[in-house]
Amino acid sequence: MDQSKRYVNLALSEADLIKGGRHVLCAYRMRPRPGHGYVETAAHFAAESSTGTNVEVCTTDDFTRGVDALVYEVDEAEGLMKIAYPVDLFDRNIIDGKAMIASFLTLTVGNNQGMSDVENAKMEDFYVPPEFLKLFDGPACNISHMWKVLGRPEVNGGMVVGTIIKPKLGLRPKPFADACHQFWLGGDFIKNDEPQGNQVFAPLKETMRLVADAMRRAQDETGVPKLLSANITADDPAEMIARGNFILETFGENASHVAFLVDGFVAGPTAVTTCRRNFPDTFLHYHRAGHGAITSRQSKRGYTVLVHMKMARLLGASGIHTGTMGYGKMEGAPDEKMVAYMLERQIAEGPYYRQDWGGMASCTPIISGGMSALRLPGFFDNLGHSNVIQTSGGGAFGHKDGAIAGALSLRQAHEAWLKKIDLVDYAQTHAELRGAFESFASDADRLYPGWRDRLRIAA
């Protein structure tokens, strides 16, 4: 059934839709299946995403038609389709009238992903109007909270030097806590890897008691505050709350030094919101494990990394993993700095829409995935600043002289970048950074040709 007369209005102006403030706008790359027209398929997509189905129904009235999603722009040659969704379509909480990402996802990338006339469709960007944006929680705290705990300036406080305890699974409570203590003697921040929780060989309560003690000892030995991101992800919100309360009680006077990690992609908006609303004073660390199945450049369905990041900020993530923009081991490219800017800035340009965040707090980029001291300067050059949380697993524990030296090498690489000193030159007077060149020699050969001669290290 051709629904284009009802669900397509190419006379609508995007500027007028934005000025009106009553529509969420979404841009998709869409390809119809062979034998189906582009505009007709786009119309069916909009219908399925809002008020329609595959047939006309007798219960439709004029009010219903007034909240139709409308295709307002198509470019068949580019495979581009833009749809305007009236804000009244989206579900609101009965307890406080707030908007929810679950409803946004259900409409914009729900049933339309499985339609028989759609070969593939992927959301590339979306725009939220000002009044509707106010209905989302947004972040309660961000990296400035960590800088304050660390005793740094709350503006431009610089990189938080972090790690992920490796191996990601298989450590019992004491070896895990010992590894934390070692890294904290040189670094700032430790996160649970996303699978770490309450395994039978590492019960959460026993582990957290030992880690809390390790933090106290490291702070006493260094005179510097330390930070931990503890995984509270669970299927049951009550379990998440129980874990969170136990961890805060266990860390006691250092409770403000704790962040909560939530596997936001696999556990979903409910888990993120559970943390955001029950622990508003705690940094909400959104881990995105699994997202690549949807957001990868290889995937032609679902949504992009940028869309995922924007949803995380709306949900209230304090920080989210953004990848390494091609400088680490994960898929990415330098132009993905747009993703970080969308999280950090009050006004940011996406590929299709400029988003004004209306004063909503920023969300912090968390950098991880194959990063070592040698890769940091190029990453910072591309991003243009170093106000990120950086977590290196192998980049710290893979250092030839151990975790303390690994942490110090990361800190020294950051110092060199801030001072605009060549990394090889800085390594000549900083033993831990020099050790990073020896530890990650293949990176050094690729990024710093001639480093062996300059550091007088034999091949």
UniProtKB/Swiss-Prot annotation:
Its EC number is 4.1.1.39. Gene3D superfamilies: Ribulose bisphosphate carboxylase, large subunit, C-terminal domain, RuBisCO large subunit, N-terminal domain. The active site is at K166 (proton acceptor), H287 (proton acceptor). Its cofactor is Mg(2+). It is an enzyme of class 4 (lyase). Substrate binds at N111, K168, R288, H321, S368. Mg(2+) binds at K191, D193, E194. Keywords: Calvin cycle, Carbon dioxide fixation, Lyase, Magnesium, Metal-binding, Monooxygenase, Oxidoreductase. The basic functional RuBisCO is composed of a large chain homodimer in a 'head-to-tail' conformation. In contrast to form I RuBisCO, the form II RuBisCO are composed solely of large subunits. PANTHER family: RIBULOSE BISPHOSPHATE CARBOXYLASE, RIBULOSE BISPHOSPHATE CARBOXYLASE LARGE CHAIN. Homodimer. This is Ribulose bisphosphate carboxylase. It comes from Paramagnetospirillum magnetotacticum.
